[in-house]
Amino acid sequence: MSKETKLQVEAIKNGTVIDHIPAKVGIKVLKLFDMHNSAQRVTIGLNLPSSALGSKDLLKIENVFISEAQANKLALYAPHATVNQIENYEVVKKLALQLPERINNVFACPNSNCISHNEPVESSFKLSEKNNDIRLKCKYCEKVFARDVVTEIEA
C-alpha cells in the first residue's frame, strides 16, 4: 500500500463499518443508531476524500453488529452507503441497503397538529420512492413529507 492510499482510519478487529456516507451525514447516522451513547469504541471519519463522492463520512463501531433492519433505516440518509460486518479484521458480510416499507418510532411527524405528538402512540411513516425522491407518509395525519423535512426533526 503506497503512502497515498494508506488507511486514514484505523481498522477494527470485530464490529460494523458504515462507509460511503455522504459528507455531513455521518453525525445523523451516529445518532440514528445511538452510537454516541455506546460503551464500545466508535471511530468517526468526517469529510474523508472519496473518488465517488468527493468527500464522505465513515463510521466504525467495535463489537457491535448492525442488523439488516437497522441497516435499511440507513437507506433514508445514505442510500448508497455500504455496511460491512467485520470479524478478525476481515469482512464477513456485506449488508445491501433497501428502503424499508415503513419506519416506526424513529422520527417525529413534522405536522405539529398530528396526534402522534399528544397521544401515546409511536410515530409511523410509510415510505415511497420515485426518481430517487424519498417521501414519507404519516400513518396518523396522512400528510406526505420529503425525506429531508422528516429527518431534520429530532424525535
Curated annotation (Swiss-Prot):
Gene3D superfamilies: Aspartate carbamoyltransferase regulatory subunit, C-terminal domain, Aspartate carbamoyltransferase regulatory subunit, N-terminal domain
Any single GO BP term: 'de novo' pyrimidine nucleobase biosynthetic process
GO cellular component terms, semicolon-separated: aspartate carbamoyltransferase complex
UniProt cofactor(s): Zn(2+)
Keywords associated with the record: Metal-binding, Pyrimidine biosynthesis, Zinc
Molecular function terms from GO: metal ion binding
Cofactor binding, per record: Binds 1 zinc ion per subunit.
InterPro entries: Asp_carbamoyltransf_reg_N, Asp_carbamoylTrfase_reg, Asp_carbamoyltrfase_reg_C, Asp_carbatrfase_reg_C_sf, Asp_carbatrfase_reg_N_sf
Residue sites binding Zn(2+) per the record: 109, 114, 138, 141
Protein family (similarity comment): Belongs to the PyrI family.
Assembly information from the UniProt record: Contains catalytic and regulatory chains.
Function: Involved in allosteric regulation of aspartate carbamoyltransferase.
Protein name: Aspartate carbamoyltransferase regulatory chain
Lineage: Bacteria, Pseudomonadati, Pseudomonadota, Gammaproteobacteria, Vibrionales
